[in-house]
Design a protein with these regions (language model features):
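Short N-terminal targeting/anchoring amphipathic segment
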Residues: 71-82, 88-111, 124-129
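N-terminal strand-loop element at the rim of the active site
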Residues: 11, 26, 32-78, 108
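Extreme N-terminal starter segment of soluble prokaryotic enzymes
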Residues: 1-4
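A short, glycine/small-residue-rich beta-strand->loop->alpha-helix junction that serves as a flexible
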Residues: 7-21
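Active-site proximal beta-strand in glycosyltransferases
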Residues: 100-107, 115-136, 154-158, 175
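A short, active-site helix/loop in glycosyltransferases that binds the activated sugar's phosphate group
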Residues: 135-180
């Protein structure tokens, strides 16, 4: 299978970089062909040794060094670009014959954005991975999960030891045990 990983978080090192490396290595180990989908001019810190597909919609938006007055503007810009990247990803899935798409670091905002774009109707399975659900975010997550439930190829995978996000009427919300 050709599996695309849509990465839009820029970090010099740490969690996101390591998680992408783990995903890519495991996909290769299982015989899949991983591909990275990233925003235009994405500044890679690591060579993952896979094909790179650049998404239209603008560069990554980061809060690094931004004043508290600039952050609300950047937040709006980030949301607009996320939707643009998802629209582009829906097109690239067809163009590059992608079988599944993984969004490795999601929040309820990612679900909301995904559901506003053609990506929700993708023939490829779309997996949004959540690294836990923060205190106070459960209600927003469940609300968006109910909306996503209408789309049979959208999966919400939560890395957690808890199972309070699971609901019988949300079959594509799934728990993934963390590697502890």
């Amino acid at each position: 299978m050709r599996v695309a990983i849509l990465e839009s978080i820029v970090m010099p090192a740490g969690h996101e970089v390591e998680f992408d490396r783990i995903l890519i290595n495991e996909l290769k180990r299982q015989g899949h062909e991983p591909v990275l989908f990233v925003p235009e001019n994405f500044p890679f810190k690591v060579d993952y040794g896979v094909d790179i597909v650049y998404l239209e919609g603008g560069e990554v938006v980061t809060y690094a060094g931004a004043s508290k007055w600039k952050k609300p503007f950047l937040s709006i810009l980030r949301e607009r670009r996320r939707r643009s990247w998802f629209i582009s990803a829906a097109e690239k899935i067809k163009e590059y014959n992608i079988d599944a798409l993984i969004i490795p670091t999601g929040t309820y905002r990612y679900i909301k954005a995904l559901l506003d774009t053609p990506l929700k109707d993708s023939k490829a399975a779309v997996h949004v991975i959540f690294h836990g659900i923060g205190k106070g975010e459960m209600d927003r997550f469940i609300k968006q999960a109910h909306r996503a439930n209408a789309y049979k190829n959208v999966y919400l995978d939560v890395i957690s030891l808890r199972d309070d996000m699971l609901r019988p009427n949300l079959p594509r919300v799934r728990k993934i045990l963390p590697p502890v």
